[in-house]
């Protein structure tokens, strides 16, 4: 699915070499790349120093949940993905004026330089706010897949590098399902340059530094303390540093533990591409395993996600939709190679490897805190699909407008005091997480908990019913456009269409799983 990077990443100890499997025959040359990539990465780590070091301190994480969000047992691969060389992308420090720490009080500091952070900083500065952006100067390294019409609506169609006229789903050996919606692959380079250009034009300031902590001053200001004893005073701070932001934010207690979507991908030149280049393969759940590999499928059901860039160049990705414990990347790679071998695909050249790690579900931020959040740090990742970039980019203007209005109304009248901050921050939080959004999220969390319990045949059965509901429903579900009332209607249709064993499972899940009680309680709250 969509790949979302984890921006605030650190390790709890010195990196250790992951266990990598090698296989005989033709699979050996395909497996070499992950080993060589790790060797090159480890060498870079050993030779680096200072803020760019690959060894980070345990204190970078607030708790075990934060560590899992950052990458947990797969952290080394998450860091390898982050450290990819993307020479085409401009450096933020070369294009944006530097923050002069201590010389002025900024209206807003945005922590984190991913798509969410850049978008919010640019939109806020466009409205006249004095905005500072703080975070390591890293490129966009993840591949993003989007529905073409959604990116067009954002005015970002020029950032799409390839479009497929339709998307296709395979569940078993029966007829495939055409979704009826064009899909695009986003150019990392074009998206980075476009968002950076917007920041430059709006006058966003920048500091290439990690943030140590955020301190609330007695005068109502926030102090952003960075490396090297640099302190930036500001009126508001928004954390957009990825899912693992517990060091700066408080999250609600009592929510289900965060789950993880992992995917291993390769862009390759191949012989015998089995897929139509005009169609993007959204999910391929067909059976491809031999008896000696069934245990892999039993523990971690996965599907193939494929983007044919040409008749011979394809991006293949083996994806575990969600798991309580992250499916290891070496197992994902093994399953991908087994699948490609079964399909008769022979890899001639590897252009790039990708390690996608997306925390899904978990807790919402505590909306009574002054420090704000945006993007994955604000739990804006869709719990059931792993998508978040379109939502972050589409909601950035609205969030920026709310912040600008708050500052105009209160600061211009010298009303922004420490005592008024909590109620003012609540206004911003309620824009990001109104009750309607919370209802939708409770529905998705209920669905996520159900998916976590299903084996491969259960997942196929679920999606057979899913794609039999009215088309506008499942298209809206995948595009995150259904209201909470629409989602209830969707659930009703699913229940009517589903086989008896799934109906029983749905009732049991609603009555016994904590997400069922949360769903009912959230829907009844107004």
From Swiss-Prot:
Cited Gene3D superfamilies: FAD/NAD(P)-binding domain (3.50.50.60)
Amino acids binding NAD(+): 108-136
Membrane topology: Multi-pass membrane protein
GO MF annotation terms: intramolecular oxidoreductase activity; oxidoreductase activity, acting on paired donors, with incorporation or reduction of molecular oxygen
Cellular-component GO terms for this entry: chloroplast membrane
Keywords from the named record: Carotenoid biosynthesis, Chloroplast, Isomerase, Membrane, NAD, Plastid, Transit peptide, Transmembrane, Transmembrane helix
Coiled coil region boundaries: none
UniProt cross-references to NCBIfam families, sorted A to Z: carotene-cycl
Record protein name field: Lycopene epsilon cyclase, chloroplastic
Species: Solanum lycopersicum (Tomato)
Lineage, uppermost ranks: Eukaryota, Viridiplantae, Streptophyta, Embryophyta, Tracheophyta
Primary gene name: CRTL-E-1
């Amino acid at each position: 699915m969509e790949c979302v990077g984890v921006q605030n990443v650190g390790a709890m100890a010195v990196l250790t070499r992951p266990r990598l499997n090698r296989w005989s025959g033709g699979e050996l040359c395909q497996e070499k790349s992950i080993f060589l990539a790790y060797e090159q990465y480890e060498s870079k780590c050993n030779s680096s120093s200072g803020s760019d070091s690959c060894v980070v301190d345990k204190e970078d994480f607030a708790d075990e949940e934060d560590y899992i969000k950052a990458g947990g047992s797969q952290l080394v691969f998450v860091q390898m993905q982050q450290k990819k060389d993307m020479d085409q992308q401009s450096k933020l420090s070369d294009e944006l004026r530097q923050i002069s720490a201590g010389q002025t009080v900024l209206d807003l500091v945005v922590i984190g330089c991913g798509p969410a952070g850049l978008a919010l900083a640019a939109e806020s500065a466009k409205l006249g706010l004095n905005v500072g952006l703080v975070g390591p100067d890293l490129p966009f390294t993840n591949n993003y897949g989007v529905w073409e019409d959604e990116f067009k609506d954002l005015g970002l169609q020029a950032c799409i590098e390839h479009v497929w006229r339709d998307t296709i789903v395979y569940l078993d050996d029966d007829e495939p399902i055409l979704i009826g919606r064009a899909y695009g692959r986003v150019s990392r380079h074009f998206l980075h340059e476009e968002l950076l250009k917007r920041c430059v034009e709006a006058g966003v300031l920048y500091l290439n530094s990690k943030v140590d902590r955020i301190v609330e001053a007695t005068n109502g200001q926030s102090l952003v303390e960075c490396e090297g004893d640099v302190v930036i005073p500001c009126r508001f701070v928004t954390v957009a540093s990825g899912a693992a932001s517990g060091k700066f934010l408080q999250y609600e207690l009592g929510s289900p533990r965060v789950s993880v979507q992992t995917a291993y991908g390769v862009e390759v030149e191949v012989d015998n591409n089995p897929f139509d280049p005009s169609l993007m393969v959204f999910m391929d759940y067909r059976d491809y395993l031999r008896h000696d590999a069934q245990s892999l499928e039993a523990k971690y059901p996965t599907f193939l996600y494929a983007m044919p860039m040409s008749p011979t160049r394809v991006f293949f990705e083996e994806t575990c939709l969600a798991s309580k414990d992250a499916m290891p990347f070496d197992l994902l790679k093994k399953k991908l190679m087994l699948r490609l071998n079964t399909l008769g695909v022979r890899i001639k050249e590897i252009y790039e490897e990708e390690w996608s790690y997306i925390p899904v579900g978990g807790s919402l931020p505590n909306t009574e805190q002054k420090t704000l959040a945006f993007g994955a740090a604000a739990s804006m990742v869709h719990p059931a699909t792993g998508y978040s970039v379109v939502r972050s980019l589409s909601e950035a203007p609205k969030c920026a407008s709310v912040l600008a209005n708050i500052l105009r109304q209160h600061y211009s009248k010298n009303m922004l005091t420490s005592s008024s901050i909590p109620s003012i921050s609540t206004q911003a939080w309620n824009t990001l997480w109104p009750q309607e959004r919370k209802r939708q999220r409770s529905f998705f969390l209920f669905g996520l908990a159900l998916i976590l319990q299903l084996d491969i045949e259960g997942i196929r059965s679920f999606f057979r019913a899913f794609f039999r509901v009215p088309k506008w429903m499942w298209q809206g579900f995948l595009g995150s456009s259904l209201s909470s009332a629409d989602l209830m209607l969707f659930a009703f249709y699913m229940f009517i269409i589903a086989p008896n064993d799934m109906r029983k499972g749905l009732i049991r899940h609603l009555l016994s799983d904590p997400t069922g009680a949360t769903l009912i309680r959230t829907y009844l709250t107004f």
